[in-house]
């Protein structure tokens, strides 16, 4: 079996050189016997410019990336047949081609390349070779023009853009859930939420009522004589101005009352304004909704009237209304 020194001598004899540094051109065409041994010595040929490896078969790709001075590479009918398929072997032609392009794209001085009759000789592979090797002048003895290089670069760009779009998270299909499944996953509606919705609806309905309608509801209620209702002296005594001021801070518009009539009976004009400004009714109801829950509409209305009193004139106005109502009920 030949030792390493004998392989060195054979390679130097083929190259007609006295040392590896002086080897500029190396022709290993159809060198099947010792080819794999010679390939192992290629990294030592740091000044090699022309390499011919045509008509050979090997079990691994030569270390082309180490030949940084290489200008010409001939691989006609060159084949690679891995001895075994494992995690590190080139199990497919696609893997083999990618590995080959990865190795030669680092050769920044390469000008001429021949790959006819190899697994690398495909349109896609040649496009990538032209794209990466910007110094390449001929490929398979065909000159590479600027127009051809530009066309190749455009094709590569489109391929990469398409690849990015396909890999984008936004391109994934969005799985939709049937409506009935969504309904089943919803949490049961809380009773307090339903109550809040009903309360809000009531507030909206009250805010839409006219001032006269609200006043008529208070005056025409059949429960005015409820035991809870106090006489006019009790209303005045139990309602402290200081306490009322803490609840509601607003002033009612002046009421039109004719004090010169007999018995000081008020004459309420048909277009008199409501004692409660319509814009503050929703706020009053919202503040007292929890306290008034479960009470009758009459009690709510009376409580709202009492809560709206801020001056003595307001009390006098309410007294007049109660007095008129009392006369009607008699």
Swiss-Prot record:
Write out the ranges of the annotated region (Disordered): 212-240
> Which SUPFAM superfamilies does the annotation name?
RNI-like
Q: Where is the composition biased (Polar residues)?
A: 214-240
Q: What is this protein called?
A: Putative protein DDB_G0285185
């Amino acid at each position: 079996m030949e030792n390493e020194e004998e392989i060195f001598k054979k390679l130097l004899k083929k190259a007609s050189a006295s040392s590896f540094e002086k080897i500029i051109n190396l022709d290993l065409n159809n060198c099947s016997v010792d080819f794999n041994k010679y390939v192992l010595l290629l990294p030592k040929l740091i000044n090699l410019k022309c390499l011919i490896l045509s008509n050979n078969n090997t079990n691994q790709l030569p270390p082309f990336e180490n030949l940084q001075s290489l200008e010409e590479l001939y691989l006609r009918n060159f084949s690679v047949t891995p001895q075994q398929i494992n995690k590190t072997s080139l199990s497919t032609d696609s893997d083999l081609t990618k590995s080959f392009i990865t190795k030669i794209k680092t050769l920044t001085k390469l000008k001429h390349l021949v790959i006819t009759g190899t697994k690398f000789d495909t349109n896609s592979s040649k496009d990538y070779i032209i794209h990466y090797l910007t110094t390449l002048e001929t490929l398979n003895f065909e000159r590479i023009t600027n127009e051809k290089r530009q066309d190749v670069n455009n094709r590569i760009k489109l391929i990469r853009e398409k690849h990015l779009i396909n890999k984008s998270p936004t391109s994934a299909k969005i799985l939709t859930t049937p409506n009935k499944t969504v309904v089943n996953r919803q949490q049961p509606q809380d009773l307090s939420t339903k109550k809040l919705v009903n309360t809000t609806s009531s507030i909206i309905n009250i805010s839409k009522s006219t001032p006269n309608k609200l006043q008529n509801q208070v005056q025409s209620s059949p429960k005015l004589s409820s035991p809870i209702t106090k006489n006019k002296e009790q209303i005045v005594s139990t309602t402290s101005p200081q306490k009322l001021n803490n609840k509601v801070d607003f002033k009612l518009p002046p009421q039109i009352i004719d004090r010169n009539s007999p018995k000081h009976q008020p004459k309420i004009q048909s277009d008199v304004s409501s004692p409660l400004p319509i814009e503050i009714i929703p706020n009053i109801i919202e503040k007292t909704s929890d306290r008034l829950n479960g009470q009758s509409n009459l009690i709510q209305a009376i409580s709202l009237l009492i809560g709206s009193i801020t001056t003595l004139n307001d009390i006098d106005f309410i007294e007049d209304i109660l007095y008129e109502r009392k006369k009607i009920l008699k």
